[in-house]
Each structure stands twice: as C-alpha cells, then as structure tokens.
Amino acid sequence: MARYLGPKLKLSRREGTDLFLKSGVRAIDTKCKIDNAPGVHGARRGRLSEYGVQLREKQKVRRIYGVLEKQFRNYYKEAARLKGNTGENLLQLLEGRLDNVVYRMGFGATRAEARQLVSHKAILVNGKVVNVPSFNVAANDVVAVREKAKKQSRIKAALEVAEQREKPTWIEVDVNTMEGTFKRMPERSDLSADINEQLIVELYSK
C-alpha cells in the first residue's frame, strides 16, 4: 500500500477527529466540518458495526503515526509476542519509532516532517546518522539534529510550535543544542486518552 499523499484534512474528517497531521498543535480550522466525513454525503455519517468501530480505531492510530498497513500489522504481531498488555505494547512500539521521537522532541512540526528529516539524514542517534524512520529508539538513546541541518528554518519553526504542546515527561530536550534524550518508554497514562488500543487488539484477535 502506497503512502497517502492527498489532503491531510480529509483523513481527519474520515476519522471524525483532529489527527494533528498538519500541525503539532491544532491542525484544523474551526470552519472545517470535522464531524462530517469527506464526500457529498459526509454529513450523514452512518452508524458503524462493532467491526467498523474497531477498523476505524485502527485506521486512526495508523494514520496518527504515519504507518503503512503491513508495518502496522507487524507492530501488532510483535506487541502480541511481548510480555504485558498487547495494546500498551503496541503504542510503545509506535512511540519508539525514530520519526515519532524526533516529532516528540520538537524537531519536526508534524510526524511527516520528522520522517522527512530522518530520511534526509538530518538526524543523529548516539552520534551516528540514522535515516530509517522506523528505527527503534531505546531508553537513554541521544537523538540530535546534525550540525549542518541546525540552520534549517523549518526546524527552528518546529521548535517554536513545540513550545505550545505539552512536553513529554519521558523525553528531555535541550533546544539550544537541538539534542534530546529518550529517557524511557512512555507509560499508558502518558499517552492520549483519545486512543482505544483495546479495539485494535479485538480487531486483530478475530
């Protein structure tokens, strides 16, 4: 499945909630009909079956983290193999992706922008260039912007946007050096309550 390149607003309208795909703070203007699905008949959002609700939740989380379907299923399989709660394991695996960590640290205004920074070799992990967005960041890893990339206006703008977001307690960032430490994996209580990971577990358990 190819990565979606269309309007970001359409994805948020599809899920009926702001996925923050255009901005790290508030992606959608109040004039936009977020409660209406895209399309001519979007205002008549149909009642979903149990399966439909589970599928929508999976699609919502997949789109928030910018992960393709096959990748997402592989994350679920890995989460199911790990000890503990499968749903929480899944969210931790997604949170540990390098592109997500770069976004959480404020170096990218969105996860898509953070993914681009990683792909363009603008990011270091423990002093070495890593250009794989799905790279798994471990506890105490140091993630930094490469010296020659620090002058990029989009990174400076992203850091300003990040100042308006709630700062993750599991990450420590020095905005002056553009360097951060991934102190630990986030607990479930650290993450958005708008995600119901149990619905995803139920979907894949069928």
Curated annotation (Swiss-Prot):
Gene3D superfamilies associated with the record: Ribosomal Protein S4 Delta 41, Chain A, domain 1, RNA-binding S4 domain
Matches recorded under SUPFAM superfamilies: Alpha-L RNA-binding motif
Protein name: Small ribosomal subunit protein uS4
InterPro entries: Ribosomal_uS4, Ribosomal_uS4_bac-type, Ribosomal_uS4_CS, Ribosomal_uS4_N, S4_RNA-bd, S4_RNA-bd_sf
Gene: rpsD
Any single Pfam family the record assigns to this protein: Ribosomal_S4
Binding partners and assembly: Part of the 30S ribosomal subunit. Contacts protein S5. The interaction surface between S4 and S5 is involved in control of translational fidelity.
Function text: One of the primary rRNA binding proteins, it binds directly to 16S rRNA where it nucleates assembly of the body of the 30S subunit. With S5 and S12 plays an important role in translational accuracy.
GO MF annotations in UniProt: rRNA binding; structural constituent of ribosome
Keyword 4Fe-4S in record: no
CDD domains found in the cross-reference section: S4 (cd00165)
Top-level lineage group: Bacteria
Keywords: Ribonucleoprotein, Ribosomal protein, RNA-binding, rRNA-binding
Family: Belongs to the universal ribosomal protein uS4 family.
